[in-house]
C-alpha cells in the first residue's frame, strides 16, 4: 500500500501579482497535519510517511489524505 504524498501550495511570486500559483508535491506532512490525523512524527515515519518538521501549515486536503490512509491500514490489519 503506497503512502500518500503531501500537497503544498507553491510560493507566490511578486512579479505575477495576486495570481494563485497552484499546488505541488511537498517534502512531507507537517506536525500539525499529523496531530490532526492522530499521529506523531515517530509513528508516521514507522508507517512510511515523510515528515517535514520545518513546515507549519495545516492543509485540510493533507489531513483528509492521512485519515483515509490510516483507515485503509486498519482495514488491512496493521496496528496504528
UniProtKB/Swiss-Prot annotation:
The keyword Ribosomal protein applies. InterPro entries: Ribosomal_eL13, Ribosomal_eL13_CS. Keywords: Ribonucleoprotein, Ribosomal protein. Transmembrane segments: none annotated. One of its GO terms (molecular function) is structural constituent of ribosome. The keyword Ribosomal protein applies. GO terms for biological process: translation. Belongs to the eukaryotic ribosomal protein eL13 family. This is Large ribosomal subunit protein eL13. It comes from Aeropyrum pernix (strain ATCC 700893 / DSM 11879 / JCM 9820 / NBRC 100138 / K1). The gene is rpl13e.
